[in-house]
Amino acid sequence: MSHNTFGHLFRVTTWGESHGPALGCVVDGCPPGIRFTLAEVQAWLDKRKPGQSRFVTQRREDDLVKVLSGVMLDDDGETMISTGTPISMMIENTDQRSKDYSEIAKRYRPGHADYTYDAKYGIRDYRGGGRSSARETAARVAAGAIARKVVPGLVVRGALVQIGKHRIDRSNWDWAEVNNNPFFAPDPAIVPVWEEYLDGIRKAGSSIGAVVEVVAEGVPAGIGAPIYAKLDQDIAANLMSINAVKGVEIGNGFAAAEISGEENADEMRIGAQGEPVFLSNNAGGILGGIATGQPVVARFAIKPTSSILTERRSIDSDGKEVDVRTKGRHDPCVGIRAVPIGEAMLACAIADHYLRDRGQTGRLK
């Protein structure tokens, strides 16, 4: 299997499977002198890990990360300092139940990558989906923790803005609420609605889709590139690579098709300190593939997981027609735990473009 690496200067390679002994990543291209602690990396992994509420998979993984290379300890015994060599991180799997998947060893789950992996490689890891499992994304979150440290002043946040047909009220948006509920919802009023709705989905053994919004603040104006190396192009690619993602938009995205040029264009004025000021941010912080200095805003849509208890029609690898129902432990809405994953992938794209701009223009420190 190829294509396990993304990025240009800030390059991330992930490895491992859902039911293997461990998984992890290698971050290559991180500049020397980047300071971070194991606790900081662990905090982001804790945000993504399973089993934290009844609304996510009950697989119990502590997701304890180990840093194996690419750093030296500071005198305080806690702070790690990057050396400029590859940073390797590992997370052990401890709660696999491969027997739960024995019934689908030859059967293709409708809506899952079972068939396409078999079509491409002639073999597939049916135990939890192997590399196609969202378990792989734990390694991306670890890499994203490093990426956040590369760009000075960068703040990346995410929130769940829609589950099924139930959307947040954007006038209630409060970042302080995101970590106060099991959905990473910025609107406290939507929480009881989602709780009741997802309880019904969960008890029925079904699943539902969602929309996640990620925002990066402190992105330097000018990073990115035109035409074939656009910042938004790479952000979209990173987000699209996340399991179950079926659509990505930047700024007002598809809503731009419904408004006029007068409404869509972000007008400008000169600020109190002589700096350029935008009067809106329909562009989502990117114009012509290059950052404007405004917050970078992206959203991505996530399909319902195909691992459900309802029987669905399918075929098996012997060419027989079968009915498939998936046992095991699964998220009724994978969009919840996709929030920190989206944050990590956005951070990695921005860190990569920051280093590329610094190498090309020399204007960034």
From Swiss-Prot:
Gene3D superfamilies: Chorismate synthase AroC (3.60.150.10)
Alphabetical list of SUPFAM superfamilies matching this protein: Chorismate synthase, AroC (SSF103263)
Binding site for FMN: R131, S132, S133, N243, A244, G288, K303, P304, T305, S306, S307, R329
Name listed for the protein in its UniProt record: Chorismate synthase
Pathway the protein takes part in: Metabolic intermediate biosynthesis; chorismate biosynthesis; chorismate from D-erythrose 4-phosphate and phosphoenolpyruvate: step 7/7
Signal peptide, first to last residue: none
UniProt-listed Pfam families: Chorismate_synt
Alphabetical list of CDD domains matching this protein: Chorismate_synthase
Self-association state and partner proteins as the record states: Homotetramer.
Cofactor binding mode and count: Reduced FMN (FMNH(2)).
Catalytic activity line of the entry: 5-O-(1-carboxyvinyl)-3-phosphoshikimate = chorismate + phosphate
UniProt keyword list: Amino-acid biosynthesis, Aromatic amino acid biosynthesis, FAD, Flavoprotein, FMN, Lyase, NADP
Cofactor(s) in the UniProt record: FMNH2
Chain residues that bind NADP(+): R48, R54
Gene Ontology, cellular component aspect: cytosol
Reported function: This reaction introduces a second double bond into the aromatic ring system.
Sequence similarity: Belongs to the chorismate synthase family.
